[in-house]
Amino acid sequence: MAADKRDYYEVLGVHKNASDTEIKKAFRKLAIQYHPDKNPDDKEAEEKFKEITEAYEVLSDPQKRAQYDQFGHAGVGAGGFSGGGFGGFGAGTPFGDIFGDIFGDIFGGRPRGSRGRRGDDLQYNMELSFEEAAFGAEKEIQVPYGKRCGDCGGSGAKPGTEPKVCPTCRGAGQVRFQQGFFSVSKTCNHCNGEGRVVENPCTSCRGSGMIRDTKTLSVKVPAGVETGTRLKLSGEGGQGIKGGGNGDLYVAIAVREHPIFTREDNDVLCEIPVSFVQAALGCEIEVPTLDGKVSMKIPEGTQSGRIFRLRGKGVPQLQGYGRGDQLVIIKVETPSNLNKRQRELLEEFARISGEDVHPMKKSFFDKVMDFIS
C-alpha cells in the first residue's frame, strides 16, 4: 500500500528542493552501497536497493517528480516501477548512463572504446661495481621497448584504411546483458574492449600497432645505491597508443662482490690480517679504504676480532648528507712452518709465562692460539 512507503526524498537522503545533480549523486552512492552484486545473499540489501531505485525512477523524471510532490505516492501509482518494472535499465531510461557508471565502479572497469592506452612499464637490470654503487656513476644502457608503428601510426590498420566500429558492442567496448532484474556489462570479446576492430591489419606490426625497437639512454646512478635499489625513469618505458602516455623504465641495481670490502647499511667492513708479533707489540699499518690507503695504529696487546672505526670512510647516504664509517676487523695470523730457532723462542716465552706446552697435554699451536686470542 502507498501508505506503507517511505518518503522518496527520505529514501535518498535529500531535501525536497534538491537539484537533479544532488538526487543523482545521492542515488549513485546508495546504489553502489546496496547493489546485490556487491551484497550477495543479503535480502535486506536487495530490498534497500529496490527501494532507492524506485525512488530515483520517480525523482529523476521531472513529470513524475511534479506529480509526486503534489499528490504523494498516489500521484505516481502504488505499484512502484512503471512500464514493466525493473527490466528497463537500457538507453532511453533514467538509469542508462548512471548504471553504466555504477557497474564500472563495482566490477572494476568501464568501456574503453577508443581511449588511449598507456605504454608498458619496463625493467632494466644494471650491475655495478662496489665503488660505482658507493660514489655514483653515469652509465649508458641499451633498452628494448615497444613503440608505435610508423606505417600505421599505432592504429594497427593497413595504411589507407581505418579500424572499423565493432559490430558486437557498437564501439562501446563492453556488451550489456540482462541477468534477472539487473543489467550487467562485460568486456566485449570481439574487440577485447577496444570498441574497434582491424579488418585489414598493417603488415609491419601485424595489426598490433606496436613494433620492437632499442633506444640508448644515459642513466645517472646516485651515490649510495645498493643491491635492490630501483631507479625510476619516468616516460622512458614503452610508448602509449591512441594518445596514451608512455610507461616508465625501472633500473634494478645489483652490486658485484668486492674482494676486500663488504657493506652493512652505509658502513664498509674489511678484515685486516696482522702477525701475532704485531698484535702483541703494537704497530702502524696501512688500511685500504674507498678513498685510498690510510695509516692506522694498532695498540699493543690487540686481540683477534677487535674492531677499529674509521669515521666518514663508509658509503655516502643515498639522497642525503654524510657518509657511514669503515669498520676494520683485526685478524691475528698464527705462524706456521716454524724453524727450530723460532720454536725454541716461543717455547721459552711459554715457560717464562708459566704456560705448559707439553705435547701430551696441549699442542704448541693450541697454546699459541690461546695466547693471541
Curated annotation (Swiss-Prot):
Q: Output the GO biological process annotations, alphabetical, semicolon-separated.
A: chaperone cofactor-dependent protein refolding; DNA replication; protein refolding; response to heat
Q: Which residues of the sequence carry a binding annotation for Zn(2+) 2?
A: 166, 169, 188, 191
Alphabetized InterPro entries for the sequence: DnaJ (IPR012724), DnaJ_C (IPR002939), DnaJ_domain (IPR001623), DnaJ_domain_CS (IPR018253), HSP40/DnaJ_pept-bd (IPR008971), HSP_DnaJ_Cys-rich_dom (IPR001305), HSP_DnaJ_Cys-rich_dom_sf (IPR036410), J_dom_sf (IPR036869)
Q: Does the keyword Lyase apply?
A: no
Q: List the disulfide bonds.
A: none
What is this protein's function? Answer: Participates actively in the response to hyperosmotic and heat shock by preventing the aggregation of stress-denatured proteins and by disaggregating proteins, also in an autonomous, DnaK-independent fashion. Unfolded proteins bind initially to DnaJ; upon interaction with the DnaJ-bound protein, DnaK hydrolyzes its bound ATP, resulting in the formation of a stable complex. GrpE releases ADP from DnaK; ATP binding to DnaK triggers the release of the substrate protein, thus completing the reaction cycle.
Q: Which domain of life is it from?
A: Bacteria
Instruction: Return the protein name.
Output: Chaperone protein DnaJ
Stored PANTHER family: CHAPERONE PROTEIN DNAJ, DNAJ HOMOLOG 1, MITOCHONDRIAL-RELATED
Q: Any domain commentary?
A: The J domain is necessary and sufficient to stimulate DnaK ATPase activity. Zinc center 1 plays an important role in the autonomous, DnaK-independent chaperone activity of DnaJ. Zinc center 2 is essential for interaction with DnaK and for DnaJ activity.
